[in-house]
Amino acid sequence: MPDKIKTIFATSSGNGVAAISVVRISGPEAINTIQQFFKTKTVLEPRKVVLKNLWWNQKRLDQAIVIYFEKTKSYTGEETVEVHLHGSIAIVGMFIDALGSLKDVRQAGPGDFTRQAFENGRMKISEVEGLANLINAETESQKIQAE
């Protein structure tokens, strides 16, 4: 049975220390979700980069790059917001924890973004299988075969 909460989030750049980490929020509440981290309402224009301070419980979490993708131009076929944070484990963890405390979003499980893309007609089953093979490729020949 599918989860009733349609808006999902997850780190899409991998885990661990990095200069930049990307957290993706995808679904009907994506814009409303990110707005909760802004001190003032901000109009997000599709595919325009915005530099914003992110706030939670009156504390500044980070200064981040925020990019909005309308559903017709996103990977998932859903309204999507990408948040490019500093890649500190503490910063990313605090942002993920804050997102997890909201009622209209849930943390994505493995393959949830691709499932959205498939359900919204953005990918065919053969593309989903090919992507899974590419992600799991351990050798160059497996990578080539997955393509």
What are the language-model segments listed below?
Residues 1-147:
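A glycine-rich (often HGG/GG-containing) alpha/beta subdomain
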